[in-house]
């Protein structure tokens, strides 16, 4: 399917038709299409596909994958959709070099992975979304989800991991101007996730040996934020003056030990990439 212009009816996104639907087929190539004002591009029980160079905007879910194993999503422009890419039970995905903008639906995300293992998310620009990246933990901890060299900026939450901690590797990503860079909710040890070589705009360390990496690890800690992390009903008050004041007091003179969200063992001093 190459070089098509696809539109749906001018109604609410849930009432529109799918711009493209694939099921029980394999080896499909969807290239350089202009798609807008649809419901979803839905791919079900269809492995080994290539989605390259497409533009999808003003829709509900740009790509909706279900059992679409070993598919490639490359160089697509996804803008003003409720969610950019959502994948359920789709192992072995490669999501690379996509630009995902303005997915600001309350429950939306730039990229959302659920019950998906052995995925590689590399070189994407994810800007101004409710959640930049959402993912649970892979079923098998050996089949990790890997995030490399992504630009994650101006999102409400940069990365949101839920479920049992572990099974994620994040290397060389840039996190800038997110309201909250990373949120991880679930049981387990936060050190079971691997973070290294990422740029954090909140890092306050030094680089005395001038190797481009901070001299000490970057620890993201939750102080008063634990209130809304552990009590979903309190998220409405996130960043309210009262919680901001409580967070300031907790950092100044902690009433209790803060919770470790993540530790980046070698934070970068400069971003690996910028937004073009």
Residue positions per predicted region:
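Extracellular beta-strand/beta-solenoid scaffold signature
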Residues: 13-23, 36-39, 58-64, 80-86, ...
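Surface-exposed, flexible loop/turn segments at secondary-structure boundaries
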Residues: 12, 41, 49, 71, ...
């Amino acid at each position: 399917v190459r070089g098509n212009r696809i539109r749906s009816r001018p109604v609410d996104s849930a009432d529109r038709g799918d711009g493209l639907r694939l099921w029980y087929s394999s080896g499909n190539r969807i290239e350089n299409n202009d798609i807008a004002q649809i419901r979803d591009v839905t791919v079900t029980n269809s492995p080994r596909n290539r989605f390259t160079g497409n533009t999808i905007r003003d829709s509900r879910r740009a790509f909706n994958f279900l059992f679409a194993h070993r598919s490639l999503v490359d160089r697509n422009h996804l803008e003003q959709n409720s969610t950019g890419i959502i994948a359920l039970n789709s192992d072995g995905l490669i999501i690379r070099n996509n630009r995902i903008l303005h997915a600001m639906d309350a429950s939306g995300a730039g990229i959302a992975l659920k019950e998906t293992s052995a995925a590689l998310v590399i070189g994407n620009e994810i800007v101004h979304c409710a959640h930049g990246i959402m993912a649970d933990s892979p079923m098998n901890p050996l089949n990790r989800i890997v995030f490399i060299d992504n630009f994650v900026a101006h999102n409400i939450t940069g990365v949101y991991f839920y479920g049992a901690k572990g099974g994620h590797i994040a290397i060389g990503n840039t996190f800038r101007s997110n309201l909250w860079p990373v949120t991880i909710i679930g049981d387990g040890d936060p050190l079971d996730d691997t973070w290294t070589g990422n740029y954090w705009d909140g890092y306050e360390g030094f680089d005395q040996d001038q190797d481009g990496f901070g001299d000490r690890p970057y620890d993201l800690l939750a102080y008063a934020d634990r209130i809304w992390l552990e009590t979903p009903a309190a998220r409405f008050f996130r960043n309210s003056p009262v919680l901001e004041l409580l967070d300031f007091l907790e950092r100044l003179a902690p009433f209790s030990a803060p919770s470790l969200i993540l530790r980046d063992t070698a934070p970068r001093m400069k971003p690996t990439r910028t937004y073009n």
